[in-house]
Amino acid sequence: MARGNQREIARQKNMKKTQEISKGKRKEDSLTASQRKQRDSEIMQQKQKIANEKKSMQTTEK
């Protein structure tokens, strides 16, 4: 009995996911793995640059 419920929940979850994709809410999923990796690396580089600037500002103040 539990498996039937589990299947139904999985079906509903999958249906919701496909509806979101068709509505265009999940645009990030349309990226390939390499594109996503490139985008994420750029974001992390920007964050690291900001963190380094904050760190250097704190050391110059002391």
From Swiss-Prot:
Tissue: Expressed in brain (at protein level). Highly expressed in the testis.
Keywords: Cytoplasm, Nucleus
GO biological process: amyloid fibril formation; protein destabilization
Transmembrane stretches, start-end: none
Residue ranges of the region described as Disordered: 1-62
Compositionally biased intervals (Basic and acidic residues): 1-30, 50-62
InterPro entries, sorted: SERF-like_N (IPR007513), SERF1/2-like (IPR040211)
Disulfide-bonded cysteines: none
Described purpose of this protein according to its UniProt entry: Positive regulator of amyloid protein aggregation and proteotoxicity. Induces conformational changes in amyloid proteins, such as APP, HTT, and SNCA, driving them into compact formations preceding the formation of aggregates.
Entry similarity comment: Belongs to the SERF family.
PANTHER family membership: SMALL EDRK-RICH FACTOR 1
Subunit structure and binding partners: Interacts with SNCA; this interaction promotes the aggregation of SNCA.
Protein name (Swiss-Prot/TrEMBL): Small EDRK-rich factor 1
Gene: Serf1
